[in-house]
Amino acid sequence: MFARGLKRKYGDQEEGVEGFGTVPSYSLQRQSLLDMSLVKLQLCHMLVEPNLCRSVLIANTVRQIQEEMSQDGVWHGMAPQNVDRAPVERLVSTEILCRTVRGAEEEHPAPELEDAPLQNSVSELPIVGSAPGQRNPQSSLWEMDSPQENRGSFQKSLDQIFETLENKNSSSVEELFSDVDSSYYDLDTVLTGMMSGTKSSLCNGLEGFAAATPPPSSTCKSDLAELDHVVEILVET
């Protein structure tokens, strides 16, 4: 019987009988703990807002394992050629780290590869523009805006107008504008009409105002009569 709170531990013989494997060595446990701590520490740094307490605990664990391995001479004795011979448990962290780095590289490819097709397209642009031959920019605008038939008719009409203006003399030009009523363009008549209208309206307004108001002499006489009457009343009292 075992005391309360104690755990039963199997011996080496009992482990073999029960089918359990041998307990891994301390160095392997320490190495696996170091690998997991490094992976967790890197994942903490990848977060936007890492947990400070968690990252400090993981960093202290890594530092403690490093000190133990340096005291045992394993830290300085690790050679790069022994990496291929390492067990699978030790390579788990390196595989995870390499996988994350490869995924980041696939998501964000190198800028040189992205710029290459752009440079090729830019180099092809002048070739395409120069292949049909040099064209007048005015002709390209005509082709884009309207069909060829409309363009020809419009140019013919413009040519006819310019020819008529060049061939006719000043008298013919005056005949063109003879139908226009010149009274609309006579500035003197317009201004005189405006001034006469304003004068008549102002005079009418002043005459009406003068007729409505009584003469000043009559108002003064009435005021004096009222004052005399008031003075007489005061004297009698």
UniProtKB/Swiss-Prot annotation:
InterPro entries: E2F-SERTA_domain_protein, SERTA_dom. Transmembrane segments: none annotated. Keywords: Nucleus. It is found in: Nucleus. Expressed preferentially in hematopoietic progenitors and mature blood cells. Expressed at low levels in the heart, lung, spleen, and thymus and at a higher level in muscle. GO terms for cellular component: cytosol; nucleoplasm; nucleus; plasma membrane. Pfam families: SERTA. Residues 26-73 form the SERTA domain. PANTHER family: CELL DIVISION CYCLE ASSOCIATED PROTEIN 4/SERTA DOMAIN-CONTAINING PROTEIN 2, CELL DIVISION CYCLE-ASSOCIATED PROTEIN 4. May participate in the regulation of cell proliferation through the E2F/RB pathway. May be involved in molecular regulation of hematopoietic stem cells and progenitor cell lineage commitment and differentiation. This is Cell division cycle-associated protein 4. It comes from Mus musculus (Mouse).
